[in-house]
Amino acid sequence: RQKAFAPVFASFRKILGDQIYSLAQEPEDTQQGKLLSDMFLPETVWQIYVVERSGDAVGFVSIRIDSDSKVGEIGLNAVHPDYSGQGIGTEMYKFASDKMKSSGMQVATVATGSDPGHEPARRAYEKSGFNVQIPSVWMCQVL
């Protein structure tokens, strides 16, 4: 997880600066590790799928199926940096979309950042068919 998300955390730190990052974002980054661990608990609503190459885990994607709303969601996901640029992300997201569709979902969603650290993920989401966006901005102020 640390290697896969390192570019994102570095991007956030560069954008926010050390003070805001350490107070406002770093706790969220740390909490992400707990969220990922919780996704493996028996009572989780998340389904986790792992991509392997030659027996090594090189990526993972989590999905949530909401049968009531008919909206599926891609949650935490990552590709090991040593395997980036090989189409693994696009493959994972197409798989996730197919899984959601076969489960009766009518819409698939994913949230991502617009920072440089998320650029590879955004490209892969777009290549796999995610083509409608809501622009969003997260703003901070030092007090």
What spans do the regions from the language model cover?
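Conserved acetyl-CoA-binding loop-helix of GNAT-fold acetyltransferases
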Residues: 79, 85-98, 123, 127
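Short phosphate-binding/catalytic loops that engage adenosine nucleotides
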Residues: 88, 105, 130
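Conserved beta-strand-loop-alpha-helix junction that forms the acyl-donor binding cleft
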Residues: 84, 109-121, 140-143
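Conserved acetyl-CoA-binding loop of GNAT-fold acetyltransferases
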Residues: 125-135
